[in-house]
């Protein structure tokens, strides 16, 4: 609250106090009139005491407000004095700054230094302009360049002549190379025709005859098996008649070896088909030679396989003839056979074609059953 507001408030309070005094004077006049009219003033005693109490309270309130107002005025005077001191200090600092700004000796020295540097730069630009003019004059002298261009043109002409000669020689070499390629292509075609003829002859005559022999051998083995069964039944009947009912010997005939041999023979004669490896014209000579060597190796394997089949057939016939002489054998694995660990059957050898019927190879067979797994009877030792 400002001083003006406080003064206006005090003025309003004084006016209210004057109005109260006027009202009190009017009330006193009225009271005096009433006293004259009414001698009994006992009812007004309490009103007078109340009015006095109110007037004392009003005086106390004005006194307290006067003290508070005096304290506020003192505080305002103190703050004004502090601001005056701050303004005086700022005026001193401002005067010092103005004095320093009015001292332009450093600025004049910097201007002199700048003028000196500008003069040096102007001199450097003049020197550069002179050097540039000299360089331009030197660059305009193209006599050496023209001489070098003439020499380069001469070299290009000579190189062009050499390239023309080389192109002629290269064309002749290319024609000769084409002739050699055509000759080799014809040779490859003749080899392919001969190979096709050989393959047709091999598969149409030799392989078919081998398959016919195998089928005949299988039929012969079937006849042997039927004869063995007939002999076994006759011998069993003879044993029952000889020993009497229920007194037949406990020996049991063994036909597993014969059946195993037949099964092994039937399994091992499966010959995988030979895929057509003849390439069209245009293949290189090395691939043709590799195909011929591969077919030769296949033929050698087939011939060795046929010889092995004939040998196994002879051995089976001999073993069957021995079994006719002696029908009762001990229940043991033959020493000249080896067991396949996949199907459990016994064969004279575990071969690649047999393992292919189990979707396996010899390498995979050894990985699954061990490197020492026997593939032939000799391996068991």
UniProtKB/Swiss-Prot annotation:
Give the location in the cell: Gas vesicle
Instruction: Recount the UniProt induction comment for this entry.
Output: Expressed from a single promoter upstream of gvpA; most transcripts stop at the gvpA terminator, with low read-through into downstream gvpC-gvpN-gvpO. Expression starts in early stationary phase and is maximal in stationary phase. Highly expressed in 25% salt, poorly expressed in 15% salt, no gas vesicles are formed at 15% salt.
Question: Which residues lie within the region annotated 7 X approximate tandem repeats?
Answer: 22-274
Sequence ranges of Acidic residues compositional bias: 276-318
UniProt-listed Gene3D superfamilies: ROS/MUCR transcriptional regulator protein
Q: Does the keyword rRNA-binding apply?
A: no
Annotated stretches, region: Disordered: 261-333
Sorted alphabetically, which Pfam families does this protein's record hold? Halo_GVPC, ROS_MUCR
| UniProt entry keywords in alphabetical sequence | Gas vesicle, Repeat
Does the record carry Repeat as a key word?
Answer: yes
An MF annotation (GO) of this entry: DNA binding
Q: How is it modified after translation?
A: Detected as 2 slightly different sizes in vivo; the proteins appears larger in SDS-PAGE probably due to the acidic tail.
**What InterPro entries does this protein map onto?**
Gas-vesicle_GvpC_halobac, ROS/MUCR_sf, ROS_MUCR
Q: From which domain of life does this come?
A: Archaea
GO BP, sorted A to Z: gas vesicle organization; regulation of DNA-templated transcription
- Outline what the protein does: Confers stability, involved in shaping gas vesicles (GV), hollow, gas filled proteinaceous nanostructures found in some microorganisms. They allow positioning of halobacteria at the optimal depth for growth in the poorly aerated, shallow brine pools of their habitat.
Query: Which miscellaneous remark does the UniProt record hold?
Result: Encoded in a 14-gene locus called mc-vac.
The family this protein is said to belong to: Belongs to the halobacterial gas vesicle GvpC family.
| Protein name, entry field | Gas vesicle protein C
Q: Which organism is it from?
A: Haloferax mediterranei (strain ATCC 33500 / DSM 1411 / JCM 8866 / NBRC 14739 / NCIMB 2177 / R-4) (Halobacterium mediterranei)
User: Gene name on record?
Assistant: gvpC
């Amino acid at each position: 609250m400002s001083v003006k507001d406080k003064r206006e408030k005090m003025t309003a309070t004084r006016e209210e106090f004057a109005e109260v005094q006027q009202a009190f004077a009017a009330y006193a006049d009225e009271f005096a009139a009433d006293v004259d009219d009414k001698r009994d003033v006992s009812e007004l005693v309490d009103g007078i005491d109340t009015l006095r109490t109110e007037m004392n309270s009003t005086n106390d309130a004005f006194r307290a407000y006067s003290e508070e107002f005096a304290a506020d005025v003192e505080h305002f005077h103190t703050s004004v004095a502090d601001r005056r001191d701050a303004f005086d200090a700022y005026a001193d600092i401002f005067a010092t700054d103005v004095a320093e700004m009015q001292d332009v000796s450093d600025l004049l020295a910097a201007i002199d230094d700048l003028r000196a540097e500008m003069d040096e730069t102007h001199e450097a630009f003049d020197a550069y302009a002179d050097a540039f003019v000299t360089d331009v004059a030197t660059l305009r002298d193209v006599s050496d360049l023209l001489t070098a261009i003439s020499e380069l043109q001469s070299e290009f002409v000579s190189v062009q002549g050499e390239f023309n000669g080389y192109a002629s020689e290269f064309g002749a070499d290319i024609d000769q190379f084409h002739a050699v390629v055509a000759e080799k292509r014809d040779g490859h075609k003749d080899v392919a025709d001969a190979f096709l003829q050989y393959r047709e002859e091999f598969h149409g005559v030799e392989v078919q005859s081998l398959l016919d022999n195998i089928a005949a051998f299988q039929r012969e083995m079937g006849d042997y098996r039927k004869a063995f069964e007939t002999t076994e039944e006759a011998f069993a009947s003879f044993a029952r008649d000889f020993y009497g009912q229920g007194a037949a010997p406990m020996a049991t005939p063994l036909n597993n070896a014969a059946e195993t041999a037949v099964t092994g023979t039937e399994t091992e004669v499966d010959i995988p088909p030979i895929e057509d490896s003849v390439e069209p014209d245009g293949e290189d000579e090395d691939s043709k030679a590799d195909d011929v060597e591969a077919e030769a190796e296949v033929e050698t394997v087939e011939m060795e396989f046929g010889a092995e089949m004939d040998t196994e057939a002879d051995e089976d016939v001999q073993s069957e003839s021995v079994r006719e002489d002696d029908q009762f054998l001990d229940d043991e694995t033959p020493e000249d056979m080896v067991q396949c660990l996949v199907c459990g059957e016994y064969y004279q050898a575990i071969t690649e074609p047999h393992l292919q019927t189990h979707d396996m190879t010899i390498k995979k067979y050894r990985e699954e059953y061990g490197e020492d797994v026997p593939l032939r009877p000799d391996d068991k030792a």
